[in-house]
Amino acid sequence: RNEEERLINHLFKERGYNKELRPAQT
């Protein structure tokens, strides 16, 4: 489901992290 992706995206937006700069640990 997109629960994990949703949480990760929320954290990225809050922290201002970019997938390129900080790849999420899958």
UniProtKB/Swiss-Prot annotation:
Q: Which biological processes are named by the entry's GO terms?
A: monoatomic ion transmembrane transport
| The keyword Lipid metabolism is annotated on this UniProt entry | no
Listed A to Z, the keywords are:
Cell membrane, Ion channel, Ion transport, Ligand-gated ion channel, Membrane, Postsynaptic cell membrane, Receptor, Synapse, Transmembrane, Transport
Q: How does it sit in the membrane?
A: Multi-pass membrane protein
Superkingdom of the organism of origin: Eukaryota
Indicate the principal place this protein occupies in or around the cell.
membrane
| Subcellular location(s) per record | Postsynaptic cell membrane; Cell membrane
**Catalyzed chemical reaction(s):** K(+)(in) = K(+)(out); Na(+)(in) = Na(+)(out)
Q: Which GO terms describe its cellular component?
A: postsynaptic membrane
Q: How does the annotation summarize its subunit structure?
A: Pentamer of two alpha chains, and one each of the beta, delta, and gamma chains.
Q: Which family does it belong to?
A: Belongs to the ligand-gated ion channel (TC 1.A.9) family. Acetylcholine receptor (TC 1.A.9.1) subfamily.
The task this protein performs is described as: After binding acetylcholine, the AChR responds by an extensive change in conformation that affects all subunits and leads to opening of an ion-conducting channel across the plasma membrane.
Q: Give the protein's recorded name.
A: Acetylcholine receptor subunit delta
Identify the species of origin. Electrophorus electricus
